[in-house]
Amino acid sequence: MLRLPEAHRDLFKKPFGTLYTSVDELLPRLEGRAVYAVGDVVTHNLLAAGVVPDIAIIDGYTMRTPCNRSPLLRARRLTVKNPPGTITGELTDAIDEAVRGQPAVIFVDGEEDLAVIPLVLAAPDGAAVLYGQPAEGVVLRLVDTAAKQEAASMLSIFVRE
């Protein structure tokens, strides 16, 4: 298991991609791409806009509060444990499996906030990874070599336990 040290948490508050105020604003950027969503609200908003994500990673919460917008997706469901502030091997294995066999929903018992990092590393070039930026909107990261390098750099800050 990898744990994000408390001293480095602020580094992860900056958007890891382009920040949009709403899903509707970024819809044209998703055309022809695999779409991967992290978070219940982002997934719900994509579905409301008519976009079914190829992979959704959800935990039933938004900003630590139970989410009444948890999306209902008809896709293979993988359930994993991932405590807050961590990236577990169970989560990364599920992400790898989901990327190989889309569509899939990964339901996280714990917290899915940091899943965007291993998701970018596992996603094929050209995929669109979206996640919520609390009280600001939605972040879109298009996967390419630079995105994977930045994700690997972020992962290097974590401590193996």
UniProtKB/Swiss-Prot annotation:
Positions contributing to GTP binding: 40-42, 59, 112
EC number: 2.7.1.237
This protein's UniProt keywords: Coenzyme A biosynthesis, GTP-binding, Kinase, Nucleotide-binding, Transferase
UniProt-recorded name of the protein: GTP-dependent dephospho-CoA kinase
UniProt GO MF annotations: GTP binding; kinase activity
Origin organism lineage: Archaea, Methanobacteriati, Methanobacteriota, Stenosarchaea group, Methanomicrobia
Protein family per UniProt: Belongs to the GTP-dependent DPCK family.
Protein task: Catalyzes the GTP-dependent phosphorylation of the 3'-hydroxyl group of dephosphocoenzyme A to form coenzyme A (CoA).
Catalytic reaction(s) noted: 3'-dephospho-CoA + GTP = GDP + CoA + H(+)
Signal peptide: none
Metabolic or biological pathway, per its Swiss-Prot or TrEMBL entry: Cofactor biosynthesis; coenzyme A biosynthesis
UniProt-listed Pfam families: DUF359 (PF04019)
GO terms classed as biological process: coenzyme A biosynthetic process
Record organism: Methanoculleus marisnigri (strain ATCC 35101 / DSM 1498 / JR1)
Family annotation (InterPro entries): GTP-dep_dephospho-CoA_kin
Primary enzyme class: transferase
